[in-house]
UniProtKB/Swiss-Prot annotation:
Residues 39-43 are annotated as: G2. An essential GTPase that binds both GDP and GTP, with rapid nucleotide exchange. Plays a role in 16S rRNA processing and 30S ribosomal subunit biogenesis and possibly also in cell cycle regulation and energy metabolism. Keywords: Cell inner membrane, Cell membrane, Cytoplasm, GTP-binding, Membrane, Nucleotide-binding, Ribosome biogenesis, RNA-binding, rRNA-binding. GO terms for biological process: ribosomal small subunit assembly. The lineage of its organism: Bacteria, Pseudomonadati, Pseudomonadota, Alphaproteobacteria, Rickettsiales. Pfam families: KH_2, MMR_HSR1. Residues 13-20 are annotated as: G1. This is GTPase Era. InterPro entries: G_ERA_dom, GTP-bd, GTPase_Era-like, KH_dom-like_a/b, KH_dom_type_2, KH_sf_prok-type, P-loop_NTPase, Small_GTP-bd. Monomer.
Length: 293
């Protein structure tokens, strides 16, 4: 215990910049869902990795953007609130895109909070015409900051980043067991897995403004688990899309979700999906509490 070190790290950035992919890469498990949809991550996802005497606690956060509706505003508030519990803040930047006004706003707010982030220039495994300009801007405007060119997808330079992070850890007791990878409840993880499969299998047919709740989790005598989940949408037409012809689409989504759950949890799962229409669910705080935002 006396040799234990601990550090908490917050990962922030624009939507689809690679935050969730980075978290999954570092902990070695697909914990945070990743889809082509923007604003996939809605709440703070905690990932944990213990390397020798050092425990690293990572916070994957919702992407920061210009919010409009109630859900989007809650997500952005959630992202900024995560900074207060972190020892180190990493701002991940998509090197395939130029700096935009939102990125500059993020930098301005960090400066106003007296936070000096570590800059992660992500997606360097793909040639970018913007990378040199991004580096020049950071060197010219943030000369005291460190930046790491990385690829969260391929793992390039991730070991070097981890060496830096662990080197900043302070002597403190671990907060979690050595083999823990998250503190999220299994019910929440199961709901996230189903939400990911909804986005992957419906793609542009369905807006991201749906939510999934695990209503029942029953441990059975044969060591398997029965899970009942409800998919909540705002329109009856979305329910029709999710169900598919004669229920074919929801069966496909359920099958893929079940397989992902069994791989992640390590035990057999009996998954039952239901769809409910709740027109104004975004205006009800109970849903935000369940989503942890």
């Amino acid at each position: 215990m006396y040799n234990q070190r601990t550090i908490s790290v917050c990962i922030i950035g624009r939507p689809n910049s690679g935050k969730s992919t980075l978290l999954n890469r570092i902990i070695g498990e697909k914990l945070s869902i990743v889809t082509p949809k923007v604003q996939t991550t809605r709440s703070i996802i905690t990932g944990i990795i213990t390397l020798k005497d050092t425990q690293v606690i990572l916070y994957d956060t919702p992407g920061i953007f210009e919010p409009k509706g109630s859900l989007e505003k809650a997500m952005v508030r959630c992202a900024w609130s995560s900074l207060h519990s972190a020892d180190l803040v990493m701002l991940i930047i998509d090197s395939l895109k130029p700096f935009d006004d939102v990125t500059h706003d993020i930098l301005d707010k960090l400066r106003s909070l007296n936070i000096v982030p570590i800059f992660l220039l992500n997606k360097i495994d793909i040639e970018s015409k913007y990378l040199d300009d991004i580096k020049a801007f950071l060197i010219g405007n943030h000369p005291d900051s460190l930046f790491f060119p990385i690829s969260a997808l391929s793992g390039k330079n991730i070991n070097g980043l981890l060496e830096y992070i662990t080197g900043k850890a302070q002597i403190a007791p671990w907060l979690y067991a050595e083999d823990d990878i998250t503190d999220l409840p299994m019910r929440f993880i199961a709901a996230e897995i189903t939400r990911e499969q909804l986005f992957f299998n419906l793609q542009q047919e369905l807006p991201y403004k749906l939510t999934v709740q695990t209503e029942k989790w029953e441990d059975l005598k044969d060591k398997s688990v029965k899970i009942n989940q409800v998919i909540i949408v705002s329109r009856a037409s979305y329910k029709t899309i999710i169900l598919g012809k004669n229920g074919s689409k929801i069966r496909e989504i359920g099958s893929k979700s079940r397989m992902q759950m069994e791989r992640f949890f390590g035990f057999p799962v009996h998954l039952f999906l239901f769809v409910k229409v709740h027109e104004l669910w975004e205006n009800h705080p109970d849903f935000y509490q369940y989503m942890k935002i």
